[in-house]
C-alpha cells in the first residue's frame, strides 16, 4: 500500500500528548487530520442515529464503509471538532451510551476491516496527520514519517487529573494512575494491533517537557523524512 499524499503518524498511549500535537501539526502544515481514537465512537453514534442494531455486523460494516466524518482543526482551546454527516458531534460521542456502543461495534472483525479502509481514505492532499495507536504499524506502515509519543504513567495520570479538575470533576489521582497502568498492559499485550512503536518511528518522551519543544522536535523529524514539507 502506497500513500497518495504525505502522511505523518502520531502513535502512543493515552495521555502522552498525541491529540494536542496532532492538532497543532495539522494546523501548522494546513493538513487534514484523522483522530482514529474517535472513529469507533462516531460509528456507534451513526448506528444509533440510523437505528442500526449493534449486533448486526453486516449493517454495521456497511455503515462503517460509508461513514461521513470529518475532523476539523482551528478551534483553539476547544480542540478538534468532530463532524458526522454535517453535524457537530464532538460532545455527543463522549456520552456513556456512545462509549458502551463503541466497545460493542469494535468487536466485529468486518467492522474493523471496513474502518481500516475508511481511515486510509483520509489520505488526501495536501497531507494527513494520523493520530492513534496503530497508525504507523497497521494503517499507514509505509510512510517514512512516524512519531511515537510516550510519557511516564505518573505524568499521564497527572495530566488527566488536571484536565478533569479543570472541567469541575472530583477525581482521585491514584485511581487514574491505576487505570492508566491497566490500560497500558491491555494495549501492549493484545493479540491484534498491540500498542508498540513502529521500528522506524521517532520516539519522543514528553515527560517534563513543554508542548512547544515537542512540536519543534516533531517538525524537525517530519522535515527530515519528508523534504517537501516546509
From Swiss-Prot:
- Name the major location: cytoplasm
The keyword ATP-binding belongs to this UniProt entry's keyword annotation: yes
Give a GO cellular-component term. Answer: cytosol
Transmembrane ranges, per UniProt, are: none
Q: Superkingdom of this entry's organism?
A: Bacteria
Reactions catalysed, semicolon-separated, are: CMP + ATP = CDP + ADP; dCMP + ATP = dCDP + ADP
Q: Which Enzyme Commission number(s) are listed?
A: 2.7.4.25
- Compartments where located: Cytoplasm
Q: Which UniProt keywords apply?
A: ATP-binding, Cytoplasm, Kinase, Nucleotide-binding, Transferase
List this protein's GO terms for biological process: nucleobase-containing small molecule interconversion; pyrimidine nucleotide metabolic process
Q: Which residues bind ATP?
A: 12-20
Q: Which InterPro entries match?
A: Cytidylate_kin, Cytidylate_kinase_dom, P-loop_NTPase
One Pfam family linked to the record: Cytidylate_kin
GO MF annotation terms: ATP binding; CMP kinase activity; dCMP kinase activity
**Which Gene3D superfamilies does the record match to this protein?**
P-loop containing nucleotide triphosphate hydrolases
Which PANTHER family did the record assign? CYTIDYLATE KINASE (PTHR21299:SF2), CYTIDYLATE KINASE/PANTOATE-BETA-ALANINE LIGASE (PTHR21299)
NCBIfam families found in the cross-reference section: cmk (TIGR00017)
Q: Name the family.
A: Belongs to the cytidylate kinase family. Type 1 subfamily.
Report the protein name in the record: Cytidylate kinase
Which species is this record about? Answer: Shewanella sediminis (strain HAW-EB3)
- State the gene name recorded for this protein: cmk
Amino acid at each position: 500500500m502506497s500513500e497518495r499524499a504525505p502522511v505523518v503518524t502520531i502513535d502512543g498511549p493515552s495521555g502522552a500528548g498525541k491529540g494536542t500535537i496532532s492538532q497543532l501539526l495539522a494546523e501548522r502544515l494546513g493538513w487534514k487530520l484523522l483522530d482514529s481514537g474517535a472513529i469507533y465512537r462516531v460509528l456507534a453514534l451513526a448506528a444509533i442515529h440510523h437505528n442500526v442494531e449493534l449486533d448486526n455486523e453486516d449493517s454495521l460494516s456497511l455503515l462503517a464503509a460509508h461513514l461521513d466524518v470529518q475532523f476539523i482543526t482551528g478551534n483553539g482551546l476547544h480542540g478538534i471538532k468532530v463532524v458526522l454527516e454535517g453535524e457537530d458531534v464532538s460532545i455527543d460521542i463522549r456520552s456513556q451510551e456512545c462509549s458502551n456502543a463503541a466497545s460493542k461495534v469494535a468487536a466485529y472483525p468486518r467492522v474493523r476491516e471496513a474502518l481500516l479502509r475508511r481511515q486510509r481514505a483520509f489520505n488526501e492532499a495536501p497531507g494527513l496527520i494520523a493520530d492513534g495507536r496503530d497508525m504507523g504499524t497497521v494503517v499507514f506502515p509505509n510512510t517514512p514519517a512516524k512519531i511515537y509519543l510516550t510519557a511516564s504513567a505518573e505524568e499521564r495520570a497527572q495530566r488527566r487529573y488536571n484536565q478533569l479538575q479543570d472541567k469541575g470533576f472530583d477525581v482521585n489521582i491514584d485511581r487514574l494512575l491505576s487505570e492508566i497502568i491497566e490500560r497500558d498492559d491491555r494495549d501492549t499485550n493484545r493479540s491484534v494491533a498491540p500498542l508498540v512503536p513502529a521500528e522506524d518511528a521517532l520516539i519522543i518522551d514528553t515527560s517534563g517537557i513543554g508542548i512547544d519543544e515537542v512540536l519543534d522536535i516533531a517538525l524537525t523529524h517530519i522535515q527530515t523524512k519528508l523534504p517537501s514539507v516546509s
